[in-house]
């Protein structure tokens, strides 16, 4: 897509050409398929654990994270994401909890540890109960200014962070203007960031892209002559996969790839830095596929399918919001065409209006099942035009790439478990790795 539509090579490909490439297995303890908590815990601690655990063993014992090791060595530390900052992946690097759902406990630990840079979404978790996002920040209406706190107590974590020396920001322009010699807390949306398709410059959301956050985090952390650890996550890639939203998956990966470019440029100028690029798991079981049209042949896809994906201008999340509570089939056809330039039939609109569980693998364990089923129905309809196949609405156990560049990056080559990533990072700090 990047080569044929954007006419440019991915930054990840550029890193692969001059760095090293390996494959990572993601299986957790006790199960065949992982979640982000277990996988991120394996990467951050070098220890496999069970589903939902945050940097704790199966028995509930804290496991030391690479961020804590860095902090103990006097290095600066940072967590950057496009999800809530308390979400599973950043949580597994900066906290310990029996469940990824313990968001308030996780945030308390972030501040107690003094993590130097914290940027992402989820300001609702930082504000006293019954308070409005817009009263605590400059977050835009599109990014959730009218939303209310998720807390059940009167704790004001933003004020507590400021007392601990953090500068709090909530808009892209504030991020650009923020000095580099500070501890930085950036919360740019009420919950997760809007999808990349819905936060383009022209949307005026005030939400920065991942590359801009990466550049600022590197400037802040690099002031420490003793070095730093930084975890950067394109977390909404996973959510787009859960929704079976091919165009959003592409847009989120491209947003992440811009951040890779920023990190790669930094590392090329710093010969003592290790850059690792990977994923905690795959989502959706997706790929381009051919379609059997008739007994005389099959359609193996073409540039036109990629062009169709490129014409989708909004995520499924925005599309289903525009449907409203009780859309007619004409409403659905109109909204789909508005955002995709694809004309769907009345029967296809009916399929979207009355969505069903598409398969046993299109999971039901969501709080808002109706939205998820609707997204999967849209994904199934558009898949015919995009020639994209989806096997599930959940995670898969497909191995993921591990790309390395810089100091100790030769160690990424080969096939390894995700817990091995911890060893590579620890050795890059000049520490020995001893396995019992």
Positions of predicted regions on the chain:
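Mobile, glycine-rich extracellular loop/lid and propeptide segments
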Residues: 1, 43-49, 57, 63-94, ...
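A post-motif C-terminal structural segment
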Residues: 1-41, 90-436
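Glycine-rich oxoanion-binding loops at beta->alpha junctions
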Residues: 52
């Amino acid at each position: 897509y990047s080569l044929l539509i954007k006419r440019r090579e991915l930054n990840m490909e550029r890193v692969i050409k001059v760095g090293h490439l390996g494959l990572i297995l993601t299986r957790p303890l006790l199960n065949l398929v992982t979640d982000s908590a277990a996988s991120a815990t394996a990467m951050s601690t070098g220890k496999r654990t069970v589903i939902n655990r945050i940097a704790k063993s199966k028995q509930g014992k804290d496991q030391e994270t690479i961020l804590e090791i860095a902090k103990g060595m006097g290095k600066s530390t940072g967590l950057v994401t496009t999800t809530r900052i308390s979400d599973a992946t950043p949580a597994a690097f900066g906290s310990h909890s029996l469940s990824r759902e313990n968001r308030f406990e996780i945030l308390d630990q972030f501040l107690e540890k003094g993590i130097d840079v914290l940027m992402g979404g989820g300001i609702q978790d930082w504000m006293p109960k019954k308070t409005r996002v817009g009263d605590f920040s400059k977050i835009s209406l599109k990014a959730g200014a009218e939303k209310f706190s998720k807390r059940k107590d009167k704790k004001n974590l933003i004020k507590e962070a400021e007392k601990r020396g953090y500068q709090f920001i909530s808009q892209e322009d504030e991020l650009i203007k923020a000095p580099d010699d500070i501890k930085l807390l950036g919360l740019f949306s009420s919950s997760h960031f809007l999808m990349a398709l819905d936060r383009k410059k022209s949307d005026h959301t005030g939400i920065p892209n991942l590359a801009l956050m990466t550049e600022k985090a590197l400037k802040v952390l690099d002031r420490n002559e003793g070095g730093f650890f930084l975890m950067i996550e394109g977390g909404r890639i996973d959510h787009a996969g859960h929704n079976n939203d091919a165009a959003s998956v592409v847009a989120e990966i491209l947003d992440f790839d811009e951040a890779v470019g920023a990190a790669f440029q930094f590392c090329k100028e710093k010969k003592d830095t290790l850059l690792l690029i990977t994923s905690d798991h795959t989502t959706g079981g997706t790929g381009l596929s051919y379609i059997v049209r008739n007994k005389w042949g099959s359609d193996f896809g073409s540039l036109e399918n990629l062009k169709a994906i490129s014409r989708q201008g909004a995520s499924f999340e925005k599309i289903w919001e525009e449907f409203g509570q009780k859309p007619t089939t004409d409403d659905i056809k109109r909204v789909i065409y508005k955002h995709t330039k694809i004309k769907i039939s009345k029967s296809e609109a009916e399929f979207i209006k009355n969505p069903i569980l598409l398969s046993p693998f299109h999971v039901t364990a969501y709080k808002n099942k109706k939205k998820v089923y609707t997204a999967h129905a849209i994904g199934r309809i558009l898949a015919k035009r995009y020639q994209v196949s989806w096997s599930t609405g959940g995670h898969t156990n497909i191995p993921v790439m591990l790309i390395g560049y810089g100091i100790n990056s030769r160690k990424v080559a080969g096939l390894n478990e995700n817990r091995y990533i911890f060893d590579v990072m620890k050795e890059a700090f000049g520490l020995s790795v001893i396995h019992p």
